[in-house]
Amino acid sequence: MSSHKSTTKSSSSGSSMSLILGFSKSMEKGNYNFSKENKKNRSFGVLYAMIKGNTFPRILTIISLLIEFCQLSSFGFKQQYPWGGDAGYYLKRIMSPVSHPSNLVGYNGFTIFFWIVIGLLLLGFFNIWYVAYQFYRGKIANIWIIRTLRWFVSTTVAVLFIPIISLLLIGLDCDYSQGGILKTFSNDNIYCFKGANLSIAIVSIILIIVFSIVGFTSSATYYEYDTNVKSRFSKPHARFDVYILFVKLILALLNSLVDFSPWTTSIVYFILSITLVFGSIIILPYNNQRLNQVKSGFYTTVFWVSFMTLVTMGINDETTATTCYITIVGAFFAFPIGYFSNRFYYNWLSSKIDQLKLPTSSSTNDFNEITKNEKSKTGDSKEKESSSPSKVTWGKQPITLGSKRQIIFPFFQNKFVMSFFVEIMVRKLLRSSNGSNGDDGISSNSNESIEHANNLYQCGLQYFPNSDLLWMAYCNFLFTVRKDRHIGYAALEKLRRMKPSFDVRFFIYQRDKEREQIMDSDLRGPEHTGKIQDFVSYMEFKKLYYGAKRHHVKCLTYIKKFWGLLLHETVDLHRLSDLSGRIATTENKANESYERLLALNPNSVRVLRDYSQFLEEVVKDTESSYKLQKKAEAIEDIMSKSQTTDFKTIDIKNLDNSDTELDQVLKQESNAIQLAKIDADIERSGSKSGSSKSKDDSSESSSSSKGRRGKYKEFQQSNAINKLSWLMIGTTACCIIFLIVMLIVLRDLSVKHTHSYQGIISITDCASEAVSIAINLNTMQAISISAGSVAFPFEAAEAMITQYRKQNDRSLIIMKNIHDAIYWGEGDPTSYVGDNLSKLKSINGFDVFDIGSTIFSFEEFNRSSTLVDNKEMIDIYSTPSVNMTILVSPPGTNSTNYITVTQTYNAWKAGNSFYESALIANKMSVQDIKDRAVFDPDFKFIILNAPSNIPEMYMKIQQVYIKSLIDDINTTLDTMLYVWVAIFCFLIILGAVLFRPIVTKISREKIRTLVLFSLAPKDVVFKLSSKKIKMTSLDSGSERDNLFDTTDDDAADGIDNHEHLQVDERKKNDDIIDDGSIVNRSINFGSHRRPLMNSTNVLASTTTINRGTISNRLNEDHDKVPLIENSISNNNKGYGWDGKSKRNLNKKSLRSVLRRLHWSYVLAIFLLFGFITMGLWVTYSVVHDNTQSGYVLGKSCSRSLDSRIINYYIAELYTFDNDANENEALEAVLQLQSNHQSLPYLEDVRPLMEGSYGCWMLNKSNCITSDSIYYNDVSIGLDWLVDQYTKHSVSLVNTDPSLLSTSPELGWMQAIGSDVVFQGLDTATFTYFQYYLSQKDWATKVLTSVLAISCVLLLVIHLLLFRPFMNHLRIQHIHTLALLRLAPDDIRFMEVSDKVIDED
C-alpha cells in the first residue's frame, strides 16, 4: 500500500548531500576484503585510522559546541555592521577575533602566524599522505603517527575550521578600487598578488580547497554510532555536521571576501541561521536528547543575532547602542525558545508511535526467540495483546530482512515524513521503556522494548525500502542493541548492494573491520574481556605480537648457533661473546613484548600459548609456563561453549576475578595452580611496559620489569657494571652542574655589567655637574659686577643670581649623591645621573627617581657593588692622588694680589671639599660676590679646580672603574676555565683509577664464562646445536606479517643478513635440519637482550641425533657457521672438548673488543669536554667583545664633559677677573675633538649625527625653528654642530678681549653653544649606552642559549649514547653469566684458573 513512496523517498535523506559527497566515490576502489584493503581501500583506511574511536569525549563535545556557538555568533559583529555606541564598539572588538584572531596583530604578525599555521597544516596533510602510503604498501604506519593524525583531525576540523579558513582568506581579501591592496592591512600598502603577499595568496587558495575537502570528508564520517559507548555522545550519522561545516565555509568566505556588501552578508547569515535552527530541531543529530536541545538553543541564539544584525543594518545608526542591548537581552530568551522547541518536536514525533498497527498473526520463525521458559511465561499475555486487530501489538512477528508484510503506520504516509524519523522514534522507544530520559545508552533495555524497536524499523523499511540512511540505522541497531550479528551482516550485505552514499559506504567499511577483529578471536580473546577496543590499540597489539614472535624465534636460533660455534676445532671467544649478546638482546625484547601484550589483552589465547612456550623453552621458568598454559586452556573451553562468534557479555565471566568460571575449572584439578598469582606476576612484571602501551619502541633496558630482573638476580654477583654506570652518570652530572653554575655566574656577571654601564655614566655626570656649578658661579660674578647701572639695576641682577643659585643647589645635591654612590658602591646606579640623562632614561622606560631634591644618607644606598673593592679603586679614594689648587690670603688687607698653591687630596675628600666650598660660595649675596669673590677662598677654590682638577679626578675614577670591571670579568672567566680544567683532569684520573679496573674485571668474568662453555662435552654440543625450532602457533596468522613494518635493528647485523622470518623460509631451514646436513643459520642476528635455560631441562627437551647422520664438514669463511662432519669416527679427533686434550681458544679478538670499552670512556670524556669547551669559547669571545664597550661608552661621556669645560673657559673670557687660561681652553678643544673623532660610528648614532634624527631637545619648545639663523647648523646634524662648536671656541680664544662683546662667535656660543650642544652630546651618549645595553642583552641570550643547549646536549648524549651503552653492556654481561644455565652440571661449577684466562 505504500510502494509508491519508494520512488519519491527512496533516498530522501541521502540526496541532500550528494553534491558535497559525490566526489568521494572515486576515493574508494575494490571490495571490502581485509586482505586487499591495503591496496584498494587506502582512502577508507586513512579515514578509519583517523576516525575509529577518536570522536570527542562528552566534555570535549560540550566545549566544542560552545566554541562553535561563539564562532557563529561572531559573524554578526563584524566591522562592516553599524553596531552603535560603546557597546557596539566593544562587541565588535571582543567577538570579531573569535573567528579572525589575526585581526589583533599587524601584517608582520599575521605573516608569522600564517606560516606557522601553514606549517602545521602541511604536517597534518603529510601525515595523511604517509598513512595512506603505508596502507598502499600493505603496512600499518607508526602508532604515534596515527595518533597525531587523529589529533590533527579532531582539532582542526571540529574546532578550528573557521579560524583557519578565515586566516587563509585574509591574504585574499583585496580592495581592487585601490589597486588590489589588502583590506585588513591597508595602512601597510600590501598588494594581494604582488611582492611578499603573492606566495601567501597562492598557498591560501590551494590550502582552502585541500583543507575543505579534508574537512568535509572527515566530517561525514566523524561520529560515534555505537550507543553502548558511554564515554562519547553517539549519533546515527553526521550529515548535519557536513551541512554545518558548509555553513561555516560560506560565512567565512562571505565575511572575508564580500564584506564590502554588508546587506548581502547579513541576509545570507540570517537565512543560514534559520536553516541551522530548523535542521537541529528536525534532524536531532545526537542520540542524547538533552544535548540536541542545547544545540538548538545555541542555534536559535545565533538566529537571534543574525536577525538583530538585519535590524541594525536597517536602522544604520552608530550613535545609539539600543540594538546592542536588545541583542544581548534577547539572547537569554532565544536560547530557551530553541531548547523547548526541540523538546516539543521530539515529544510530538514520539507520540506518533501509537498509530503503528501490526498484524495479529504470529509466526514460529522468529529468529531471536528468548528461551522456552520465557515463552511459557509470556505467551498468554502476548496472545491477548494480539487478539485485537485495532490495537498496536508488540508480539513476535515473522522477522525477515526488509519484511514484505503490511505494517500499517498512517503517519508514514504523509509527504513531509522522512526516513530518518524512524531512527528518532526508535530512540524514544528504547529510552522510555527503560525509564530514561537523558541517557543515550540503551544496553539495559528490556527485550520487549528491543522488539518494539525492531518492529518499528521493519515498518520503516516497508515505507522507505531504498533509504540507505535507514538501512544503516537498522544495521547499527542489530549490531549494537539487538546484538543479532547474523541478521546484521545480512542487512549489511543488502546495504552494500544498494550502492549507498559515501558516509554509508564508510559505515560498511567500519563494520567489516570490526567483524575481522571479532573473527580474530585467538588474538582478542572473548568479546569485552580484552582491552583491545579501538583501532590504534588493536594495530599496536598485532604489531607487538608479530615482533614478539620474531624475537622468540631469533632467540632460539641464536642458541643453536651458539652451540654450533663450539663445534669448531678452535673456539673464537669473540664470536661466542657476540652470539651471547644477541641471545640476551632477543630474549629481552621477546620477554618485554610478551609482557606488554598481556598488559594490553590478558586473555588472548595465542599470546598466552606463545609466552608459555617462551618461558618453558628459553627462560626455563616451568612454573609460570604451566600457569599460562592452564589459563589459555580455560579460556578456550569457555569460548568453545558458544555456538557462534558472538561472545556476549553474559556468557563470558571476567577471567581476572578470583571467583570466575575459569578459576572454578582450575580448582577442580588438584595439581592446578591458581591464576591469580600468575596474573599478579604478569601485572607486576609488566606494570611499566603496560602503562606505556602506546609506545612502539620497546626500551633496551631490563629495568622496565622488576619481575624479569629478579630471574637473573643470582647472576649479578658483580657490581662492576653498576659502578661503571654510576661513574658515567657522575661524569655527566658533574659536567651539567658545572654548566649550570657557569650559567648562573655569567648571568650574575651580566647584571653587574649592566650596572657598570650605569656607573660609567654616573661618574662623568658628577664631573659635569661640578663644571656646571663653576659656570654658574662665573656667570653670577659677571652679573654682580655689571649690576647697579641704570640699564641693569641691582634688583634685576638679584633675580638672575637667585635663579642661578637654585640651579647650583640642585647640581650640588646631584653631585653629592653621585659622589657618595660611587664611593659606597651603589649596586644599581641607574638613577644617579644628571637631569638630561635622567629624562632620557625616563622617556625610554628606565625606572629612575629624583636625586636632585635631597641628599641621601649612608643607609639609603644599595652597597652591593664589588668594583669598589678593587685595589686601584681603594687607592684612589684612600691615598693622596688628586692635585687641588687653593687660594692663599695676601699679607696685606688692601692688597689686590693673591697667590695659589697646590695641595694633594684623595678622591673622596677632594670631592667633599669641592662640595662644601661650592655650598658656601653659592650662598654669597650679590654684593659679596661683587666685592669679595676675587679674594674668597671658597669661591676661588671652585673656580680654580672645576675646569681641570675635578674633571681629571673623575676621569681617573672612571678609567679605574672600567678597569676594575674588566678585571672582575677576566677573573671570573679565568676561574671558570681553571675549574673546568681541574674537572677534566679529575675525570681523566677517575677513568684511569676506577674505569680500567672495572673494565678489566668485566672482561675476565666474560672470558671465564665462555671458557667454561668451551669445555662442554661434544655429544652435548651435538645435541644442543641440532635441536629443531618449532613454535606451536607460529603459522597461525603469519600470512599477515606483511601488514606491519617489521624493520628493526636486525638490518645492522653483519652475519647471515637474510632472515625475514617468512613461513616458507622457516620451513626450508627446518627441512635442512631434518636432513641432518646443516645447522640452521637462516635466522638473522640482531638486537640485544636477556637469558636462557638450565642444562637439565635443555638435555631433557633435546632430540638425540645419531652421530652417523651428521653430514660431512665443509670449510667456510670465518664469518659463517661451519658445517659438521657427517661421519666422525670414534678414533678421529672430535670437535668439542673430549675431556683430555687442551682446548684451542682464540681470546685475542675478544680482548680487542673489550679494550674498546676503555676508548668508549675516553670518547665520552672528550665529547663532554668538546661541548663544554665550545660553550666556554663562545662565552669568552662574547664577553671579551663586551668588555671593550666600557671604554667606548666612557669616551662618549668624556666628550660631553669636554663640551662643558670648553663652555666654562669661554664664559671666563668676559668675567673681568683675569682668570682666563687660553692654553687650557685650547687643550679642552683638542680633547673634545680627539674623543669625537675616535668614537665608532654606530648605525644607531648615524641619524643623530647626520641630521635625520630631528630635534633632540628634551623640551621640544626649545627646538631651533626653521626661521632661526642657526637652524642650518643644527639641522645638518650633531656631527656638523660639534665641528662648528670647536671652530668657534678656538676663534673666541684667539679674539682680542676688547672685541669679544661684538664677536659673532660669542653670539653663536650663547645661542646654541650651551644647552643645544650639551643635550645633543648627552643624547649621543645615551644612544651609545642603549646600543651596548642591547648588545649585552643579546650576548646574555646567546650565552644562556649556548650553555642551556650544552646542558641539553650532555643530557641527550647520556640518554642516547652513554645510558644505552651501559644498559647494553649490563644486559650482555649479566646474560653471558646467565648462560651458565646451559652448561652441563659437570662443568657448570668448574673453576678456571687465572692462567687460562690471561694466556693468549
Swiss-Prot record:
Its Gene Ontology cellular component terms are: membrane
Instruction: State the compartments where it is located.
Output: Membrane
Give the disruption phenotype, in one or two sentences.
Null cells have increased numbers of peripheral cells during sexual development. Indistinguishable from the wild-type cells with respect to the cAMP response.
- The positions making up the signal sequence are none
**Transferase among the record's keywords?**
no
Indicate the transmembrane segments per the record.
59-79, 112-132, 152-172, 196-216, 240-260, 266-286, 296-316, 320-340, 726-746, 975-995, 1162-1182, 1342-1362
Name of the protein in question: Tiny macrocysts protein C
Q: Which organism is it from?
A: Dictyostelium discoideum (Social amoeba)
Gene assigned in the entry: tmcC
